[in-house]
Amino acid sequence: MALIEDLNHFINYFPLVLRLFFLVVFGLYSFTLILHLLVINRVDVFSLLHTPLPVNRSQQANAPLWQLSFSLSILGTLLFVIAESLYLISGSDELAYVPVFIFGVIVFMPVHKFWFFQRKVFTRQCLRILGGSYRPDYKFPDVIFSDLLTSYSRVIADLWLAGAILIYVTDSPNNSHRKQYENEVIMSMIAAYPYAIRFRQCLIERSSADNSSDKFWSTLNSIKYFTAFPAIFLGIFAKKRFSFLWFLWNTSSAINSTYSFWWDVSMDWSLPFFKQPLSIQNWKFGVRRLFPTFTFAVVSAIDFVLRMAWVVRVLPEHQSAFFTTDFGIFIMQFLEVFRRCVWVFFRIEAEASKSLAYVNISDRSDIPTIHPD
């Protein structure tokens, strides 16, 4: 208990808005690293993501997308340090919001500077996805970003709480105001919206499919996202441990996590582990993959553990209570963002293996790609 109190005291040095900002900056660094690792493994990631190709496709330093991601990572780090310094010096978290706001303005500002074209494409992608749609010729990057939003769903919901704290809190920011100002209904609706986006995208994909097989798999994919809704909303009412609603909540979480894990491995990563798990022949890949089977097995195990992180709720009450504290919630959000970053890397790797999107070290191309203008 003393350790938990110490951790909660430590997290109070980082107000909620900075914890959320940290997760955004971490995601940017992770994406930059993903691009780097894919490029050094000869994956034509910039073509897969429909971004302008650099002159030398094997050098990510020339790619505008990599340059923007890396620059935003550095900028985010500097603004985070400034925001934290302002918070520690002033003792008020209002000033900490200013650098975070500046970061958002820089990302979306309609100024022809700082990789304007890439930011414009990203802004239009955000507007398109928030409307629950995607461009058929831009499907892969849209789906990647939409799935990324599902892992940031609780982070996005906490933005509402951060806004409420900014508006209503007048006392010491060192106190946790989560229980006082969080609205579970509103925050659950916000958290569910990214899943609703993917659910609608799957229905659109199903309606436009040309054959029954594509319709079938699109239907199964839509069911995966639909199973997230009970896991989100039942938590509002399942307050009493071992009640019927509590068991129903955990059951729905188990169904969603297991289904999503199977889809991650079998469909998104195109791994054959679940065809006949006891047959070693089915653990061999029929197409080019970047890593040996053991690597994929380890990553799949990590994905399973992180998908099942919700089981902390069934721990003894004195242990599960830690994950309802500010520090515990932050750790769970961080682990989910980390899991999604790993998923993104291997999702792009799987797409490259299916489409043979690899480049030769001497391959040079200045052919532009189509963007959703």
Swiss-Prot record:
InterPro entries referenced in this protein's UniProt entry, alphabetically: EXS_C (IPR004342)
Pfam families listed in its UniProt record: EXS
Keywords: Endoplasmic reticulum, Membrane, Protein transport, Transmembrane, Transmembrane helix, Transport, Vacuole
Disulfide bonds: none
Localization per Swiss-Prot or TrEMBL: Vacuole membrane; Endoplasmic reticulum membrane
Keyword Transmembrane helix on entry: yes
Similarity comment: family membership: Belongs to the ERD1 family.
Species in which this protein is naturally found: Schizosaccharomyces pombe (strain 972 / ATCC 24843)
Span of domain EXS: 178-373
Chief site of localization: membrane
Membrane-protein topology: Multi-pass membrane protein
An example Gene Ontology biological process: retrograde vesicle-mediated transport, Golgi to endoplasmic reticulum
Reported function: Required for the retention of luminal endoplasmic reticulum proteins, affects glycoprotein processing in the Golgi apparatus.
Chain ranges passing through the membrane: 20-40, 69-89, 97-117, 149-169, 216-236, 242-262, 291-311
Name of the protein in question: Protein ERD1 homolog 1
Cellular component terms per the entry's GO annotation: endoplasmic reticulum membrane; Golgi membrane; trans-Golgi network; vacuolar membrane
The keyword NAD appears for this protein: no
